[in-house]
């Protein structure tokens, strides 16, 4: 097994995969967990774990089934001490995975995601009074803020439902907002 002190690259590694129904790499434990989930959630669970195992297997020069990761649903993934940290996120069309020697978090959302961005912004985020709160750029700004907050919570190994109330996101004003 290649541990970090023998690993040449100390920068984060990021992988992006389209969701294609690939579920060919799963441990017995992961199959047991999948059997307890709805069909849709089981498919997402198995495919995301397959990609995570394939990517980390390549990184550490291991058979994907030998990657010693624990990645239970709704919990942060864990690697043994000395193997760094990983975080991953998925939407209905893609999965993104990041690995680094230090704690790290990542989130992905579709730009065309249908959500009540005005309500989300009002509840969780600060905004400039000079911004147009009805446009597509405002919606994208809120989605970017959401990704940043969710990635930070993952970095801290927290739980979104419990920890979002503790997050405050401050953004730099745009040149237009500075006057």
Segments (PLM) and residue ranges:
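Core catalytic alpha/beta fold that binds nucleotide/phospho-ligands
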Residues: 1-172, 176
């Amino acid at each position: 097994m290649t541990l970090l002190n023998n690993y040449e690259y100390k920068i984060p590694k990021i992988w992006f995969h389209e969701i294609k129904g690939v579920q060919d790499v799963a441990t017995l434990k992961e199959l047991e967990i999948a059997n307890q989930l709805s069909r849709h959630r089981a498919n997402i669970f198995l495919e995301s774990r397959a990609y995570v195992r394939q990517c980390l297997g390549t990184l550490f020069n291991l058979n994907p089934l030998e990657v010693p990761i624990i990645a239970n649903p709704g919990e942060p993934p864990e690697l043994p001490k000395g193997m760094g940290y990983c975080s991953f996120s998925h939407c209905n069309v893609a999965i993104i995975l990041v690995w680094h020697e230090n704690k790290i978090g990542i989130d992905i959302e579709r730009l065309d995601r249908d959500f009540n961005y005005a309500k989300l912004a009002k509840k969780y985020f600060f905004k400039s009074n000079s911004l147009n709160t009805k446009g597509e750029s405002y919606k994208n700004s809120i989605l970017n803020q959401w990704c940043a907050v969710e990635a930070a919570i993952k970095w801290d190994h927290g739980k979104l439902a419990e920890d979002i109330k503790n997050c405050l996101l401050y953004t730099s004003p745009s040149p237009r907002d500075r006057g």
